[in-house]
């Protein structure tokens, strides 16, 4: 889990737009965040396997 201070800092509106960055809405992780879902790759995988994300399924070819 991310530090609460860093999560709060990321939620504040930055002075300049380029200073803003994405964090996972579930765990607060700052890297590998999918904007469409607002989740990091780890949380996205866990929720997809649990069937909590509608329309997402494991690919097979």
UniProtKB/Swiss-Prot annotation:
Q: Which GO terms describe its molecular function?
A: rRNA binding; structural constituent of ribosome; zinc ion binding
Q: Which cofactor does it need?
A: Zn(2+)
One Pfam entry for this protein is Ribosomal_S14
Q: Where does Zn(2+) bind?
A: 24, 27, 40, 43
Q: Which GO CC annotations does the UniProt entry carry?
A: cytoplasm; small ribosomal subunit
Recorded superkingdom: Bacteria
Output one GO BP term. Answer: translation
Q: How is the cofactor bound?
A: Binds 1 zinc ion per subunit.
Q: Does the keyword NAD apply?
A: no
> Which controlled-vocabulary keywords does the entry list?
Metal-binding, Ribonucleoprotein, Ribosomal protein, RNA-binding, rRNA-binding, Zinc
Self-association or partners: how does it assemble? Part of the 30S ribosomal subunit. Contacts proteins S3 and S10.
Q: Which family does it belong to?
A: Belongs to the universal ribosomal protein uS14 family. Zinc-binding uS14 subfamily.
What this chain does, per the entry, is described as:
Binds 16S rRNA, required for the assembly of 30S particles and may also be responsible for determining the conformation of the 16S rRNA at the A site.
**Any idea what this protein is called?**
Small ribosomal subunit protein uS14B
